[in-house]
Structures are given as structure tokens and as C-alpha cells.
Amino acid sequence: MGVLRLLVLCTLAACCVARSPPAPPLPNAPFAPLRPLGCNDSEVLAVAGFALQNINRVQKDGYMLTLNRVHDARVHRQEDMGSLFYLMLDVLETGCHVLSRKALKDCGPRIFYETVHGQCKAMFHVNKPRRVLYLPAYNCTLRPVSKRKIHSMCPDCPHPVDLSAPSVLEAATESLAKFNSENPSKQYALVKVTKATTQWVVGPSYFVEYLIKESPCTQSQDSCSLQASDSEPVGLCQGSLIKSPGVPPQRFKKTVTVSCEFFESQDQVPGGENPADTQDAKKLPQKNTAPTSSPSITAPRGSIQHLPEQEEPEDSKGKSPEEPFPVQLDLTTNPQGDTLDVSFLYLEPEEKKLVVLPFPGKEQRSPECPGPEKQRTP
């Protein structure tokens, strides 16, 4: 029995000595958790500005967005790869069309009864030592302010109207005809109406914004505007058509106004805009510019969704409010994170990868968020 007991003890000792090697760490594990940041922090505001510049720059349609406030901000510091910011931004639509390529500082928000507001979620990569600024992904959701809110604040103010309404098209075509008649050297054709409001002044009045393109016709060719043309929009016009009581047999007297602003010409590479140029090229050294042969890699993933106005039902008391700006942005659902290849930003032999985590929710938000609004929305 003593010999048997000795054999058992020896066996246990051998098992303890011959331990298996420790398990390797999980690949792609995050270097550190997301850290909340104050929404009025100077670094956060700077990164939010860069993110919106890039979002505006990659758009082909619509109006530029400006920052109203930072709603939430987190950062993931990643050693030699710099930082990846996760931002939720409250935004306002400006009066500058994205094709104008104006500096955002020159574009103010719209007057309150034309307010279009919303939220954007964005991921933004910053590597200061390597002078890299990059927008991997974004999504935005926008809504106009409801007619009910506008009417409660200003019953006589203009309110939005359907862009396809016959009176809207009439206002656009008649104001463009006026512009063409006053500028006979070159004629322009309507591309599409982008904004329209209506108001009763001394009669029904319509105020429109619309894109125009060059027309190959002269002033004497009335049917030329119907010819097909592949030319790009060259400007944005603002027109109005005000109808007042006329002298019989005329029912209405029409007053038409128009002004047009032309876009600066944009040098395009074959196949469209070079997405590498959208990553704030002035901030990056030449060697870090992404090659033009890989536009699909460098272009940020995202879109801007336009939703109809959100009316608040009269019996909504006690009910959970509907999310006004539903925005989803998830490059991964893996809580441990996945990697995103950004080697094209560095152009070095070794691979460069960012760790991307699921976009954070409201939990563990900084007490300094949301930040202060620049403009109070209706």
C-alpha cells in the first residue's frame, strides 16, 4: 500500500511540472477600451470638424452639413497606429450645395423655417506623428423641421412644399427663363429642383432652389432646353414666383425674381473624383497620398439618409418617443474588434491595420456630453 501511495504522489508531481504552455493572446484584441471624451474638448471639436469636411467632400448631391454640437465622443488609442475616434454629431444643413465646394466656414445654417437637422455617426482615424487623417466610415440621417412646429412659431412664414408640385416647376422654369433672357450669351437648362417653399403674400408665392447646366442652344432656340445633355450641373439658382391680383381678364399678375451662383470648376480624374483627395490632402505629406488606382479602398463607407418630417401625434403623452434620427454604423459586431487594413495610407512594406470595435451606445458616455448647441433647433 505504501508503494502504491508513493507512485500516485510521483505521478501528480510529474503532471504539475509538465504544465502546458500558456495560451497565446487572442488575435486582434483591442489595445485598450474605448475612452469617453468631453464633447466640448478642443481635440474632439477639431476631429469633428475634419470628419464633417470629409463627409461633405465625398457627396455628389445635396447641401453641405455643419456642426451644431458634438453629441458623444469616444477614442481608441492604438499605440503606434494613433487613434480611432467614434463620434456622434448633431448637424444642420447649410445653404451651400456640395457641388459648390465652398469652405464650410463660409456656409451658415438655414433660416429656422427651412431647418433641416439630424445626426451623423463617424469613425475618424488620426495619426499625428505620421500626419494621417482618414474617415473610414460614416452614416447620417436628416429630417426637416415639421410644419406644425414652424406654424406654431411663425404662422405666416413659408413652409416646405412637394418638389414635384406643378407650381414649383412653374416657379423654376419661369425664373430660369428670366435669367436666360437677361444673359443671352449663354443659355442654361434646368437639372432639378432641390428646395421649395410656399407662402401667401398678396397671393400664392413660391420660392425655389434648383441646379442648372449649360445648354447647347442660343436664346432663339426655344426647344433647345428639351435636348438631352450629359453635362454636369454648373450652378445653383434661387427663384421666386409671386402671384398678386391682376387686372381683368388676367386673374393674377406674376412677379418673378432670380439669382444664380456658379460653381468653381473641379478638375476631375478619369472615372470621377479621386477619393484619396477627400482625406484632407493639405494635412498629409505627398508620400502618404493614396494611389489613384485604389479608389474603392480609400473611399469612406457611408451615406446620408433623408427622412420626412416627424410629426408629434396629439395623443403622444405617456408614450415612448420615436427615435428622431435613427443612425446605424457598425463595421463589426465582434465585441473583441476586427481589423481594418489601412496600409494604403502609409505606403510602407509592412501591413498597417486599425482595430475597429462596435460603435458604442449611450452607456459610459462622458458627463460633459452632449456639448452646447451652436444654434437651437425648433
Curated annotation (Swiss-Prot):
Residues 286-297 have a biased composition (Polar residues). Keywords: Disulfide bond, Fertilization, Glycoprotein, Metalloenzyme inhibitor, Metalloprotease inhibitor, Phosphoprotein, Protease inhibitor, Repeat, Secreted, Signal. The modification Phosphoserine is found at residue 316. Residues 1-18 form the signal peptide. One of its GO terms (cellular component) is extracellular space. The keyword Signal applies. Glycans are attached at residues 40, 139, 289, 292. One of its GO terms (biological process) is binding of sperm to zona pellucida. Protease inhibitor required for egg fertilization. Required to prevent premature zona pellucida hardening before fertilization, probably by inhibiting the protease activity of ASTL, a protease that mediates the cleavage of ZP2 and triggers zona pellucida hardening. This is Fetuin-B.
